[in-house]
């Protein structure tokens, strides 16, 4: 199992990175996210009792309405009130199903130092995707800024061009990954 953690601001291209990597990889690629369990908890405790759909948390038209709730539940409630590694433990359990398989698992929402360290500790790669000029780029919530000064990423991708340019970068990344490269710094030209 190869694990790739992806970090970046909201709407920077983390899920698009996963989708493109999945297209270009020769081995099966699976997506996990710390927020999957978070969204399931929000759904079960808040949305479902009111007859609302789980898809509201992922739908581009409705998910922003829930962002503050997700941030509060995930950070202020679970991480601070329970324990810092609450989501890490949940994701670690999910990773077990891929152990000893020739697959790539992409974790599309690495946001905190302990998540970053966990991925590195199991031999995973860390990718930082940035996208200059995003609206709401000044969101100061800890889940948006905790890794801003982290220098230990294996790859930095500046997603400042077209989708085709981003796709080309991801194809190059897959090539570097297949060749066994540990560090592959790439910059998009837009």
Residue ranges and their predicted role:
Residues 1-4:
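Extreme N-terminal starter segment of soluble prokaryotic enzymes
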Residues 6, 107:
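Hydrophobic anchor at the beta1->P-loop junction of P-loop NTPases
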Residues 10, 90, 114-122, 128-190:
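Small-molecule kinase domains that catalyze NTP-dependent phosphoryl transfer to phosphate-bearing small molecules
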Residues 14:
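Conserved lysine of the Walker
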Residues 17:
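Hydrophobic positions on the alpha1 helix immediately C-terminal to the Walker A/P-loop
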Residues 23-31:
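Post-Walker A helix-loop "phosphate-sensing" segment adjacent to the P-loop in P-loop NTPases
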Residues 34-102:
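ATP-dependent small-molecule kinase phosphotransfer cores
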Residues 109-112:
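Short, well-ordered beta-to-alpha junction loops that form the rim of enzyme active sites
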